[in-house]
Amino acid sequence: MIENVMKEGFITTSYDSVVNWAKTGSLWPMTFGLACCAVEMIHSAAARYDLARFGAEVFRASPRQADLMIVAGTLCNKMAPALRKVYDQMSEPRWVLSMGSCANGGGYYHYSYSVVRGCDRIVPVDVYVPGCPPTAEALIYGILQLQQKIRRSHTIARA
C-alpha cells in the first residue's frame, strides 16, 4: 500500500490504495445459509477461527447493513427469487462468496428438478469456495482471496 516514505515522515500513496485497504478491513458479511455449509460458516465466526481477525466482524441480519453475501448450501428454485431480492437490497459495493459444491454448481443435487445449478445464475459471484461442506479454513481462505480482489480493484475510473 505504501509506495513512498519520505525523510520528513510523509507517506505518499494513491487514493485507490487507501480506499481499497479500508474496504478489505471492514467487510460486513450477511449469512444466507441454506444447508449444511451454514454450520461451517457459523463455525468460522466462533472463537477457534475468529473471522473478526480478517475484518469480517459480525454477521449482519439485514442486507442493508451488509456488503458481503455468503451463499452457503443448496439453492432451490423457490429460494432463487429471494436470493436475488436480498442481493438487490445490499449496499454498494457488494460482493458474493459462493460456499460449497451445492452453491457453486448444484453439488450432489445437480440433476434434481428443483435445484439451481449454481448461484451464479442468479447473482454475480466473486469467489467460489469448493468442498462438501468446505471447512472453516477454506471459507477464511476464500475471504482472503476476496480481499486480494478488492485490493486490485479501482475506485476511481481510469481515463
Curated annotation (Swiss-Prot):
Reaction(s) catalysed (UniProt annotation): a quinone + NADH + 5 H(+)(in) = a quinol + NAD(+) + 4 H(+)(out)
PROSITE patterns on file: COMPLEX1_20K
Species per Swiss-Prot/TrEMBL record: Verminephrobacter eiseniae (strain EF01-2)
Family: Belongs to the complex I 20 kDa subunit family.
Full protein name: NADH-quinone oxidoreductase subunit B
Listed InterPro entries: NADH_UbQ_OxRdtase-like_20kDa, NADH_UQ_OxRdtase_20Kd_su
Cofactor: [4Fe-4S] cluster
Quaternary context: NDH-1 is composed of 14 different subunits. Subunits NuoB, C, D, E, F, and G constitute the peripheral sector of the complex.
Domain of life: Bacteria
Protein's membrane topology: Peripheral membrane protein
Short name of any one Pfam family annotated for the protein: Oxidored_q6
Compartment list: Cell inner membrane
GO cellular component: plasma membrane; respiratory chain complex I
